[in-house]
Amino acid sequence: MAVRKFKPTTPGQRHKIIGTFEEITASVPEKSLVFGKRSTGGRNNVGKMTMRYMGGGHKRKYRLIDFKRNKDGVPAVVKTIEYDPNRSARIALLFYADGEKRYIIAPNGLQVGSTLVSGANAAPEIGNALPLENIPVGTVIHNIELRPGQGAALVRSAGNFAQLTSREGKYCVIKLPSGEVRQILSACKATIGSVGNSDHGLESSGKAGRTRWMGRRPRNRGVVMNPVDHPMGGGEGRASGGHPRSRTGLYAKGLKTRAPKKQSSKYIIERRK
């Protein structure tokens, strides 16, 4: 996908960079795979704010995505490639040979009319989902499971990809987009290729209003708050705020926040950068 800039006929157009949507082939989603989605506004079940800077935005409907790819051996044809307001990647509608319809994350290079299949006997081609033990070393992958049959949990956002670097016994060594190198069970599934919409990171809203349409509220800096509101607030005039901290007092910009005794740490060979 490419991006396009605009002539600065208005202040909001001057810095606006958005996608061209040239790969989108359908404007109406599959009705059987769409459900209502209520906006939380960053509040939990008792109404307490648990995430700041969320609220408003355009109404969205949730598209049910197949992250498990468990219809092994059943071929599917790519019917459409669609926009999904709930994620940065595009989604593809699959029509299976037995009549079932499912959405998947659209990988880079996927075309309408392509035939996809999942399972141990599938060819390592773009869009096919295979167990890691059946994927050649060095292959670029995405939608990676952490536990067999659980569904893809890693490498799902636009433009991302991981690489299968080696095998060690019943584990495969994967290099993730963050730079982390970790072991994952060879029975876990992954999809061949990288996630589509790779130019998403180049986009710029251009104006505050477009950001509000996305459901993101203004983000205020801690150093301009009062001491009651933030550890970095207060002071006479423009103060530096001291050591960078989060609102809850954790050191920012360098503090490792991962739990030191986390069970899964034994699978991490090299920490993320």
From Swiss-Prot:
Annotated protein name in UniProt: Large ribosomal subunit protein uL2
Gene Ontology cellular component terms for the protein in this record: large ribosomal subunit
Listed GO biological process terms: cytoplasmic translation
InterPro entries the record matches: NA-bd_OB-fold (IPR012340), Rib_uL2_dom2 (IPR014722), Ribosomal_uL2 (IPR002171), Ribosomal_uL2_bac/org-type (IPR005880), Ribosomal_uL2_C (IPR022669), Ribosomal_uL2_CS (IPR022671), Ribosomal_uL2_dom3 (IPR014726), Ribosomal_uL2_RNA-bd_dom (IPR022666)
Gene3D superfamilies: 2.30.30.30, Nucleic acid-binding proteins, Ribosomal protein L2, domain 3
Subunit structure: Part of the 50S ribosomal subunit. Forms a bridge to the 30S subunit in the 70S ribosome.
Family (UniProt): Belongs to the universal ribosomal protein uL2 family.
Residues covered by region (Disordered): 196-273
HAMAP family, alphabetized: Ribosomal_uL2_B (MF_01320_B)
Composition bias type Basic residues, residue spans: 209-220, 255-264
